[in-house]
Amino acid sequence: MSLGYNFCPLVREICDKYGVLLIADEVVTGFGRSGAMFGSRGWGVKPDIMVFAKALTAGYVPLSATVLNQRIEAAYLDNCDARGLLMTGFTYGGHPLACAAGMAVLDIVEQENLPANAALQGEYLLGQLLPFESRFRSVGNVRGKGLMLALV
């Protein structure tokens, strides 16, 4: 959970150095839970590919997405007869209800500034939990970002 601020930027640097794509799985960390819109961005990292789901519709309807950087998008545009479309899904795999739910959730996340609220509430909760490290022998440490906290 708490990786230290330099860890993720160092991973980004290594990926860039060796030409490796950095893929961020934001299924759990996306849409504000970590105190930033996406966990990777909260660590100061811009991945090449992001995948997310669940929180995109607040769990009401199944929906997931894969987001690509401009370089990868350009590769599809340059090498595809379908004008850059990613022909990897099927019509029965997505539907207007899920997309409408996703748009509604994104509106609420933005309007209510949920990432900033998660950061604020998480800071408070972390402060309340930190004394557990010295109070309970079974708690080694308390760590995390935003509302993604752990007692380890």
What are these regions (language model features)?
Residues 1-152:
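Conserved N-terminal phosphate-binding loop of PLP-dependent enzymes in the Aspartate aminotransferase
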